[in-house]
Amino acid sequence: MPFNGEKQCVSEDQPSDSDSSRFSESMASLSDYECSRQSFTSDSSSKSSSPASTSPPRVVTFDEVMAAARNLSNMTLAHEIAVNENFQLKQDALPESSLAGRVRHIVHQAFWDVLESELNAEPPEYEHAIKLFEEIREILLSFLTPGGNRLRNQICEVLDTDLIRQQAEHSAVDIQGLANYVISTMGKLCAPVRDDDIRELKATSNIVEVLRQIFHVLDLMKMDMVNFTIRSLRPHLQRQLVDYERTKFQEILEETPSALNQTTEWIKESVHEELLSLSEATLTPGAENNSKPSLSPTLVLNNSYLKLLQWDYQKKELPETLMTDGARLQELTEKLNQLKMIACLALITNNMVGALTEGLPELAVRLKRISAVLLEGMNKETFNLKEVLNSIGIQICVEVNKTLMERGLPTLNAEVQDNLVGQFSSIEEEDNPIWSLIDKRIQLYMKSLLCLPSPPRCMPPVPGGLAVVQQELESLGLQYANIVNLNKQVYGPFYANILRKLLFGEEATGKAEASSSTN
């Protein structure tokens, strides 16, 4: 309808294919206007595939860049639909206080005011109303399945705009009757969640307000239809996701050779760390060791995945192969950091007052709840962690003393309380031993999950000191393992090529050079 083309957004803030296409078309037009052809030279494309290569740099054209963007948009959308059970489309509601929101409200109101004045005129002017019914007819027809011929014919017959115009010319048109038919038809086609909206439409007497609300409910029904289609597609996408994503990424790689640069650096960093660790472990003082340490590709890749649990998602760019799961990994990491902090607080509390509170599981639950509530949002930049840890320490002391008093036991003295609060506050300090210990144990637990078959038959045992967060840790661990296992299935061949070059490339090159010198 006029003035009703609100932009729709994808929940989870994912880009839509249509937005990408419109952007591509507008940019292509601009490119044609400014120059006959615009091209971009990728940094990685200028690098030779081997040290001896003298091939000229590959030029990536503008069209190839935009084609890669469309492929990435399609792949991201398909991935989100398949792995996110809560994914749905929803309308983008502009804040009423914003300039855009106020402008839209004014323009909409002006349109409906004009329509009302036309219908109240003597004689009434029906042309705008007829155009609205024409648009309503097309929307209703779009909801029908191919087999709905009977209802299709009925809609076309009742909302025949040529006939309505003839009736209007003779002042015989029944606008209210047409609106009632539309509402009745909407009631047959809508999802049960819209039944209340249909009842409100039937109870509205002002014809202009009825038409206005009809379009509002039709917009909701369109979203319902799209989300129903998404739910129907999800099982099919889940079955085809691995092949689809791998094919799309291969197309992106062909159009943009630099599409694996960040991924290569991500894996290379793990290779260097593992080589350093292995060298330090195997090097004997005073002995000469000329052999190159051998690394397991699986070990290197798993350690690369573990690095994502300590990633700075605000400042550090993700590997290209993990872009589709970036938001999930960031959320998982933030929740994991909160669990680490809760486990640290519980361990300190248990070490200091565990003997006094032994056999009081309800107290442990209360202390955990206090920590979890106060640590909510701890990953935000504005969060004052030291102050919150101090507050948690004070609250813990209050709860422990309250429990001890209820059982007629002596409360914690001031020295113990100060010591407890002080240890809590020191957790945020760099290289804190308690934090390092808990972090290492959680890393070991997550690493053990990556070695299990998918799906795992049973969960591995939780390391000591983590029992207080066992349930939450197992849940996050399963989410993490599912993300990693799906990512391995999709991008395994690309990782294999990168690992082959990083782990065996120099050796292969050396053999080739030795062979050529012998000949």
UniProtKB/Swiss-Prot annotation:
Q: Which residues belong to the signal peptide in this entry? A: none
**GO process terms (BP):** muscle cell migration; signal transduction
Task: Give the induction text.
Answer: Gradually increased during muscle-derived satellite cell (MDSC) differentiation.
The entry's keywords: Cytoplasm, Cytoskeleton, Phosphoprotein
Bias class Low complexity marks the residues at 17-29, 36-55
Q: Which Pfam families does the record match to this protein?
A: Tcp11
Q: Does the keyword Acetylation apply?
A: no
A GO CC annotation given for this chain: cytoplasm
Cellular compartment(s): Cytoplasm, Cytoskeleton
Described by its record, this protein's role is as follows: Promotes the migration of muscle-derived satellite cells (MDSCs) during differentiation throught interaction with FMNL2 and therefore may participate in microfilament assembly.
Annotated family: Belongs to the TCP11 family.
Q: What is this protein called?
A: T-complex protein 11-like protein 2
